[in-house]
Amino acid sequence: MGITIEAMKMIRGEAAVAGGSRTKEMVLFGLFTALIAIGAFIKIPVPVCPFTLQLLFTTLAGLILGSRNGACSVGLYVLLGLAGVPVFTEGGGPSYIFQPTFGYLIGFIAGAWLTGWISERSGDFSFGKTLFANLAGLLVVYLFGMVYVYIINNFYLGTPIGVWPVVLYCFVLAVPGDICLCILAAM
């Protein structure tokens, strides 16, 4: 059921020949930055690990905008939040880097880039290949997020946490919903 290669090239601007492609690129940057910010506030309450729709929009940014533009769009979202615009789930500002969840924001940038990079190189936007790209990006997001949670809790906040509790609470309990978002983004 996946999207056609021609349609994806048109969306990414690869088929554009002249003039408005830079404007189109800027509009798509802004659109995905706004969608990610909106996704931060669409919370789906589940026990222990409520999740947001940010992952859906960061994944789609990588798929639709490509590796460079997708990562830049997510990076713009993070920069806006660090500049004080309250676009993160718990507000914004430079002190947000001390929040345990900040690693996931860094992971969103890397995950969008990897998702876009894999989809660009596959040359085929079938469901299976797109899902593979999405899951690879998801793993990168979780890698950055879990490492950051461990480091910030143990070395800055002074609330020691072991590796296994981080894996349990930040991966095992949280990943099923995000896998569903990866499947949704691949459709």
Question: What do these predicted regions represent?
Answer:
Residues P50-L55, G92-P100, I161-F171:
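Non-cytosolic membrane-interface motifs at loop->transmembrane helix junctions
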